């Protein structure tokens, strides 16, 4: 299905395994403008891509930062955006990173009944870890040979998710924490399929023309330039409180902890995709403009996918009409987004 979608776009060229190496920026009449990127496809092999509009979907905002955009990182102070759950002082704390994996029981292998991860005994032979076990039905649970089973794996802190050395250190800690679990699984006939990379919840957040805040989410705000609908609660993983946290409880530093706090739908404004400092550039994904608390909600895949679709439409419009992305009207973008199955009408019910 994915290949068919790509084949239907004659002007689309997909380059896998590529990484942005450098950004081309020209001096504009007001702001500097991104005019292309240098992409590395193998060690020592790179090429230049010229562009009328570039979209940074790196997750960490690498292209935007290299282009000179202002970025936020870590927790914002309460006074920065008037968020009730923010700490009094800003710091560099970010959410934990997580390494997930699948397991599958090989035919004929004996069920795991002892020595399970976390000491859990599962007579069905399916070894869940924590709250991971997700099965389509009770029947599927009785026949573990039928499919793959997702495990949350391990969540570990990372001092700086922007630093590859620190990220590698967290990667190693996570693997060490799961090593015993994997040994038990292998012993009892399970294959283990680790995700190729550890999951990073939070890195740079690029300051845009609008900064999404906790108050927007709690109050279910739909700005007039909404281009995507978000429906996920505030969900900050493992805040730096010494005592066990509870939903809505208070941390050691005075913050109001918001782990899994459900909220109503809210809107992602187009201005949050438009960097404040640079032209010729849009951002989408978890690096779009928002606070640390707000990002704990909009970082999930369905929301960033919607924002990414809006950014793609906006980039096409800007290139076609030779306009800066910031000069587009949100109504133009919404009109095109209404053609595919994009549920923007929820914002205006």
Language-model-derived ranges and their functions:
Residues 9, 28-31:
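Acidic-histidine catalytic/liganding microenvironments
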Residues 2:
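Sequence context of c-type cytochrome heme-c attachment sites
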Residues 17, 21, 31-36, 40-53, ...:
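Flavin (FAD/FMN)-binding glycine-rich loop and adjacent Rossmann-like elements that form
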Residues 6-21:
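A conserved beta-strand/loop element that lines the FAD pocket in flavoprotein oxidoreductases
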Residues 24-25:
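Trp/Phe/Arg-rich N-terminal binding region typifying the photolyase-homology
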